[in-house]
């Protein structure tokens, strides 16, 4: 489930920087939740265009770092751990299983 949350966060930060919808971004993150997370810019595209052609590497590195610490930012702002986003991620996985929609999720 962490992969779904982290991928959504990564896509959101990229979308904000590029002024596009997160729905137009395809991205892949590997590893655990937090510092061990590995976003893969090589496999990140915006409407099929590699993100590395749309944004400079320094800005991309900053977005990756923000993605890694984004959960902690949320906890500091809310004063508690998130509950809505993990629930929504779990619901997406359950729906995909029940409906046999053959969706691929980045989970660990």
Q: What feature does the model see in each segment?
A:
Residues 15-108:
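Long, compositionally biased stretches enriched for glycine and/or charged residues
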Residues 1-11:
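Rossmann-like NAD(P)(H) cofactor-binding subdomain of soluble oxidoreductases
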């Amino acid at each position: 489930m962490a992969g779904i949350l982290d991928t959504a966060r990564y896509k959101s930060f990229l979308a904000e920087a590029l002024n596009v919808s997160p729905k137009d971004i395809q991205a892949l993150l590997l590893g655990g939740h937090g510092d061990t997370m590995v976003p893969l810019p090589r496999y990140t595209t915006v409407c099929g265009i590699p993100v590395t052609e749309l944004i400079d590497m320094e800005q991309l590195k900053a977005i990756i770092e923000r993605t890694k610490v984004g959960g902690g930012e949320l906890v500091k702002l809310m004063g508690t751990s998130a509950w809505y986003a993990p629930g929504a991620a779990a619901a997406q996985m359950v729906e995909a299983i029940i409906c046999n929609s053959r969706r691929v999720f980045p989970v660990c």
